[in-house]
Amino acid sequence: MVGRAVHKALVAEGHEVRILTRNPKKQGEFAWNPAKGSIDPAALLGVDGIIHLAGASVSERWTASHKKAIMASRVQGAETLYRAVAAMDVRPEVVISASAVGIYPNSYDRVYTERDGGAAGFLGDVVRAWEAQADRFEALGLRVAKLRIGIVLGQGGGVLATLLPLFRLGLGSALGSGRHWMPWIHVDDLAQMCVRLAADRNLSGVWNGVGPESATNLEFSRTLATVLQKPFWMPAPPAFALRWVLGEMAQIALMSTHCSAEKWRAIGFSYRYSDLRSALANLV
């Protein structure tokens, strides 16, 4: 979902885009296999920048094997790219690495900026390892930008693919207390962030990939029901029930992360979808 949006945005700006995939079938697609550390040598020749979004989904049940896949897919992908770039005589100028707001500790009252971090637990460990791999490219002379992505709203995947079937039946509800913050962003705005980071040589470091305003889970759920013109009356499943059903993965559904977008405002970034209602209305 995110990759498709970024591809579309880059093409619209006149860029030639190459796609790394395990099974190349179309023109512009090149083979790679991060688990084996292999990549088509032609994939990176002549490119100006790399946007690394690959990683196993965190929205599947966290079995021991899937947790290994979540970590390995991010670290191995970055490592494969790093070795390929290190071997090049003429290197790309920039690497933009996806990251995640999971690096921030759970909080109901704090607003996190890019200077913050320190989350304990599995998600925090994954994000720290992910960003550390991205930072290695600086030693190769590349500009590095890390995009800590929040809850992406888009069609065909993400949180809406999970919520819409229930909400369209009028069976949607908040989760737990509903107090936890959801740092949402429309996928098209996220794609434009990637384009801006790739194009502007003055931008590097950490950036929160979130919209200009967060919403609590209760606000998000009620707004989604309103946009769909459906009732919003179902009682919220308690947090302990979610933990029983989802296991450790329940922390994704219940984590509270209120993130600042001030850094984007400061450089004049213009959001196409600056409020939750307009973002949801565009997608449903």
Which residues does each PLM region occupy?
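Conserved beta-loop-beta element that borders a ligand/cofactor-binding pocket
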Residues: 99, 132-155
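NAD(P)H-binding glycine-rich loop region in Rossmannoid oxidoreductase-like domains
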Residues: 26, 31-77
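Glycine-rich "substrate-gating" loop/helix at the edge of Rossmann-like oxidoreductase active sites
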Residues: 117-123, 150-157, 177-187
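Glycine/proline-rich active-site loop of Rossmann-fold NAD(P)-dependent oxidoreductases
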Residues: 128, 140-142, 153-162, 197-207
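Mid/C-terminal beta-alpha module of Rossmann-like enzyme folds, strongest
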Residues: 197-248, 281-284
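Alpha-helical substrate-binding/gating segment
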Residues: 164-172, 180-215
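Conserved Rossmann-fold NAD(P)-dependent oxidoreductase catalytic core, especially the SDR/UDP-sugar
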Residues: 79-121
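C-terminal amphipathic/interface module of NAD(P)-dependent oxidoreductases
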Residues: 251-284
